[in-house]
Amino acid sequence: MSDTLTNTGRYQATFAKLKAEGRGAFVPFVTLGDPSPELSLKIIDTLVQNGADALELGFPFSDPLADGPVIQGANLRSLAAGTTPTACFELLAQVRAKYPELPIGLLLYANLVFANGIDAFYAKAQQAGVDSVLIADVPVEESAPFSEAAKAHGIAPIFIAPPNADSETLALVSASGEGYTYLLSRAGVTGTDTKAGVPVEEILSKLKTFNAPPPLLGFGIAEPAQVSAAIKAGAAGAISGSAVVKIIETHQHDEAKLLATLGDFTRAMKAAT
């Protein structure tokens, strides 16, 4: 795994810096263009300026299989605002220009990658300054065409380590992934209703044995105590999606309140790392 070939440098630098500080990463997820492209940029600014260590960003998609109603709502709002993949790449380029050292990951579905050809998608992502891509509906066993295109464009392929995975799958995830490992705290759809509760220590110790990229715990991370628990269990940090998007949903018509609430939430989650 040569750093000259892949763009995992920003992740490595971020994780190394956090490790030196004895902290973990707080990584929020939002859908690009939710509730509008203009406000989406202000939301991203608010997240970064209040302590987000990296970003996980989605492209709006009308049929998100793995997502609960909160993130589906984000997709629909973004699409209603006219957010296209081209608009998403433009937003990404703006974020990258503003935050040259921030790790930026995409979390999306295979259809969006297939739409204009796999290679063309990764070429655009590279041009926009993207560090990693996680394709939610492509398991590691079927990921070769995506991984090859990603690596050809210096982008880290990210894989999900499911809570019910056997050692063979975890070994494959560890060997195939770069940047970070997305560790699911439970199987199912995203959301904050069921609190993250699967004992992850066992999976974390296996990932460590297999020398996996740093694991970030996601799914159901909605409060600071869960961030602390994830890091205490051995995760390199935590990803929070539905809880962040819920704030956008609640205050979508009141920009000042939305950004203030989001800032408070981000600071509280980061403080728990």
UniProtKB/Swiss-Prot annotation:
Its EC number is 4.2.1.20. Pathway: Amino-acid biosynthesis; L-tryptophan biosynthesis; L-tryptophan from chorismate: step 5/5. GO terms for molecular function: tryptophan synthase activity. PROSITE patterns: TRP_SYNTHASE_ALPHA. The active site is at 56 (proton acceptor), 67 (proton acceptor). GO terms for cellular component: cytosol. It catalyses: (1S,2R)-1-C-(indol-3-yl)glycerol 3-phosphate + L-serine = D-glyceraldehyde 3-phosphate + L-tryptophan + H2O. It holds the Pfam family Trp_syntA. Keywords: Amino-acid biosynthesis, Aromatic amino acid biosynthesis, Lyase, Tryptophan biosynthesis. It comes from the Bacteria. Belongs to the TrpA family. NCBIfam families: trpA. Tetramer of two alpha and two beta chains. The alpha subunit is responsible for the aldol cleavage of indoleglycerol phosphate to indole and glyceraldehyde 3-phosphate. This is Tryptophan synthase alpha chain. The gene is trpA.
